C-alpha cells in the first residue's frame, strides 16, 4: 500500500454544489437562497443567539454560579497512580517529577480508585477516607 494509491470509499465523498449555473441544475438563479431578505445577500445573516431584536434567552435568564480559582490549581490523584512515583515518599514535588500533575498545581488530593501494592508515605497531600484505608492496608502511611 502506498499513499498515492489510497482513495476514499465509493460514495464517501459527494460532489460540491455548483450554484447559479442554470435552472436545470435545481440551484440556478437564486442559488438556493430564496427571494430577497438579509439571508439572501452576500455577507448576510445574523449572529448566533440573535432573536430579531427580542431580548435573547441568554439575557432573559439569570446569572448563576462562579468558577473557583482554587479548583484551577488543585489536582485529583488516584491511588493506582501513586505506584508511578519513584521512591517511597509521595509529595507534590514527587507528583510533578513523575508528570502526574502539571507545574501550576499547588494542591492535590488522593482518591480511592484502583489499588496499590507497595507501601508509600504520602506527605502534605489531602487523602480521602477510602484512599487512606487502601494506603495503610498496603503498609504505607500518611503524614500531614
UniProtKB/Swiss-Prot annotation:
The keyword RNA-binding applies. InterPro entries: Ribosomal_uL15, Ribosomal_uL15/eL18, Ribosomal_uL15/eL18_sf, Ribosomal_uL15_bac-type, Ribosomal_uL15_CS. One of its GO terms (molecular function) is rRNA binding. The keyword Membrane does not apply. One of its GO terms (biological process) is translation. Coiled coil: none annotated. One of its GO terms (cellular component) is cytosolic large ribosomal subunit. Pfam families: Ribosomal_L27A. Keywords: Ribonucleoprotein, Ribosomal protein, RNA-binding, rRNA-binding. Residues 1-49 are annotated as: Disordered. Gene3D superfamilies: 3.100.10.10. Residues 21-31 have a biased composition (Gly residues). NCBIfam families: rplO_bact. Belongs to the universal ribosomal protein uL15 family. Binds to the 23S rRNA. Part of the 50S ribosomal subunit. This is Large ribosomal subunit protein uL15. It comes from Shewanella loihica (strain ATCC BAA-1088 / PV-4). The gene is rplO.
Amino acid at each position: 500500500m502506498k499513499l498515492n494509491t489510497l482513495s476514499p470509499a465509493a460514495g464517501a465523498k459527494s460532489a460540491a454544489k455548483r450554484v447559479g449555473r442554470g435552472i436545470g441544475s435545481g440551484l440556478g438563479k437564486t442559488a438556493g437562497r430564496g427571494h430577497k431578505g438579509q439571508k439572501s445577500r452576500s455577507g448576510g445573516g445574523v449572529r448566533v443567539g440573535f432573536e430579531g431584536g427580542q431580548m435573547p434567552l441568554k439575557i432573559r435568564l439569570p446569572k448563576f454560579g462562579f468558577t473557583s480559582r482554587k479548583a484551577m490549581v488543585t489536582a485529583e490523584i488516584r491511588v493506582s497512580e501513586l505506584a508511578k512515583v519513584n521512591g517511597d515518599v509521595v509529595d507534590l514535588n514527587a507528583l510533578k517529577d513523575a508528570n502526574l500533575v502539571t507545574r501550576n498545581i499547588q494542591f492535590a488530593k488522593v482518591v480511592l480508585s484502583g489499588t496499590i501494592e507497595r507501601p508509600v508515605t504520602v506527605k502534605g497531600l489531602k487523602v480521602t477516607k477510602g484512599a487512606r484505608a487502601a494506603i495503610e492496608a498496603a503498609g504505607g502511611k500518611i503524614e500531614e
